[in-house]
Swiss-Prot record:
Example GO biological process: response to retinoic acid
Disease: Spinocerebellar ataxia, autosomal recessive, 27: A form of spinocerebellar ataxia, a clinically and genetically heterogeneous group of cerebellar disorders due to degeneration of the cerebellum with variable involvement of the brainstem and spinal cord. SCAR27 is a progressive disease characterized by gait difficulties, eye movement abnormalities, dysarthria, and difficulty writing. Some patients may lose independent ambulation. Additional features include spasticity of the lower limbs and cognitive impairment.
Identification of the protein by name: Ganglioside-induced differentiation-associated protein 2
Signal peptide: none
Database matches in PROSITE patterns: MACRO (PS51154)
The UniProt record lists the keyword Nucleus: no
Residues covered by the Macro domain: 43-223
Record gene name: GDAP2
SUPFAM superfamilies per the UniProt record, alphabetical: CRAL/TRIO domain, Macro domain-like
Biological source species: Homo sapiens
Database matches in InterPro entries: CRAL-TRIO_dom, CRAL-TRIO_dom_sf, Macro_dom, Macro_dom-like, Macro_GDAP2
Family statement drawn from the similarity comment of this UniProt entry: Belongs to the GDAP2 family.
Taxonomic path: Eukaryota, Metazoa, Chordata, Craniata, Vertebrata
Modified residues (Phosphoserine): 280
Length: 497
């Protein structure tokens, strides 16, 4: 009680239930490992561990109110950021905190620095700076965010701190996708507690209403509360779970040592067949970047963490979740762009799908919703053979899909998309887009290379698809007539595109 007799606003972390306590029914189950896991069943890389779960707390509330050894403040490089977490900490800590911060002379992204807690219940504040997120620099952002969590925990260990209260380090204003950031946060904390956590008794994740659902969904993947939950969670783990410390792994930067140096590696020979929508990569800036998803998956297989069958099952479940969401989400804003639509059939009777590059304002739309819309439209189309016509006509840098988005789309979609795609007609390519496509199909998705046909004029396209079978955006017709001359006196009517 404070001097006025009012109850304290601060919350003692020892009074909060641990993550493990939230699933007592399953924890008390009499099922044994042998009963749940068959002899050839692959165990999760994040095993059920009662002791680790007892150290973790998920709490909805203000991190500044926690009574623990240290709380975490997320800020900017000058430690002057005005976000809800920082403002609450500064208000409760008092003016002495600002004076102390001036002595630190800032903090670089990924670093962690220590000050006293002053008027807070926590003895210390650990300040860190989360990365600004841009999808083209995703790998760097992942590494920086990992460093934030890792350096906070390392500092806590060096200072013999028994309890740490984490805010969500990836602040909304820095643009980091919450779910991606949560994966990094949880796996980093899990690995640290396993390897270095002997002196740390409590780690609290203090979250808001908006963040709680994501943490509730992902915590079972990294902190399963029972053998059953461990088994259920395995298919939902992402392909990249980091190294032994939870640090993001970049396959193309790893030195690979082959058992037989003179022999070709299987994992460089086997590539999935190309996915039609990857033609959207055409014109993307990062054409020389080689993505390593297949390598990541095979790395897990070699480590004995996932079998091929488990990977296929995991992929199918993941796709089904996207499909269910696509069917329930309101995607009218994406549909109104008229960037993807079905038209007629080609000369072989295969369905023709059109992608209009100029109608994709990449910087203005939610790309996750764009992915959902693609799945919503294409799921029933891809069950049989189809072709894609991509109009690159008059696109600008604001219409070029990021390679990371295309990589994500490639990872998500079902195998039928790749198997039944028979041709991609890339209309009105530029020199840059041709080079981009060559690099992408040579190094990343080799199965797509033979399916792409660059088409410089509509006249060339008509040798494969009759003009009556395609709905053309008016600006495509105008551009082609201006550049190549009018080959036809009339074209089929077009929708209002």
């Amino acid at each position: 009680m404070d001097p006025l007799g009012a109850p304290s606003q601060f919350v003692d972390v020892d009074t909060l239930p641990s993550w493990g306590d939230s699933c007592q029914d399953e924890l008390n189950s009499s099922d044994t490992t042998a009963e749940i896991f068959q002899e050839d069943t692959v165990r999760s890389p994040f095993l059920y561990n009662k002791d680790v779960n007892g150290k973790v707390v998920l709490w909805k509330g203000d991190v500044a109110l926690l009574n623990c050894t240290a709380i975490v403040n997320t800020s900017n490089e000058s430690l002057t950021d005005k976000n809800p977490v920082s403002e609450s900490i500064f208000m409760l800590a008092g003016p002495d905190l600002k004076e102390d911060l001036q002595k630190l002379k800032g903090c670089r992204t990924g670093e962690a620095k220590l000050t006293k807690g002053f008027n807070l219940a926590a003895r210390f504040i650990i300040h860190t700076v989360g990365p600004k997120y841009k999808s083209r620099y995703r790998t760097a952002a992942e590494s920086s965010l990992y460093s934030c969590y890792r350096n906070v925990l390392q500092l806590a260990k060096e200072q013999s701190m028994s309890s740490v209260g984490f805010c969500v380090i990836n602040s909304a204003k820095r643009g980091y996708p919450l779910e991606d950031a949560t994966h990094i946060a949880l796996r980093t904390v899990r690995r640290f507690l396993e390897i270095h956590g002997e002196t740390i008794e409590k780690v609290v994740f203090a979250v808001s209403d908006l963040e709680e659902g994501t943490y509730q969904k992902l915590l079972p993947l990294y902190f399963p509360r029972s053998l059953k939950e461990e088994n259920r969670s395995l298919p939902y783990l992402p392909a990249d779970i980091g190294n032994a410390e939870g640090e993001p792994v970049v396959p193309e930067r790893q030195i690979r040592i082959s058992e037989k140096p003179g022999a070709p590696e299987d994992n460089q020979e086997e590539e999935d067949e190309g996915l039609g929508v990857d033609l959207s990569f055409i014109g993307s800036h990062a054409f020389a970047r080689m993505e390593g998803d297949i390598d990541k998956q095979r790395k897990l297989i070699l480590q004995g963490q996932l079998s091929e069958a488990a990977l296929q099952k995991q992929h199918q479940r993941n796709y089904n979740r996207w499909l269910c969401q696509a069917r329930s989400e309101d995607l009218s804003d994406i549909a109104s762009l008229k960037a993807l639509y079905q038209t007629g059939v080609d000369n072989c009777g295969r369905t023709v799908m059109v992608v209009v590059g100029r109608n994709i304002p990449v910087t203005l739309i939610d790309m996750d919703k764009a992915l959902l819309y693609f799945i919503h439209v294409m799921d029933h189309i891809a069950v049989k053979e189809y072709v894609l016509v991509y109009f690159h006509t008059l696109t600008s840098e604001y219409n070029h899909l990021d390679s990371d988005f295309l990589k994500k789309l490639y990872d998500v979609v079902d195998v039928k998309y790749k198997r039944n795609l028979k041709a991609v007609y890339f209309v009105h390519p530029t020199f840059r887009s041709k080079v981009s496509t060559w690099f992408f199909t040579t190094f990343s998705v080799s199965g797509l290379k033979d399916k792409i046909h660059h088409v410089d004029s509509l006249h060339q396209l008509f040798s494969a698809i009759s003009p009556e079978q395609i709905d053309f955006p008016p600006f495509v017709l105008e551009y082609d007539a201006r550049e190549n001359g009018p080959y036809y006196t009339s074209y089929p009517p077009s929708p209002d595109l």
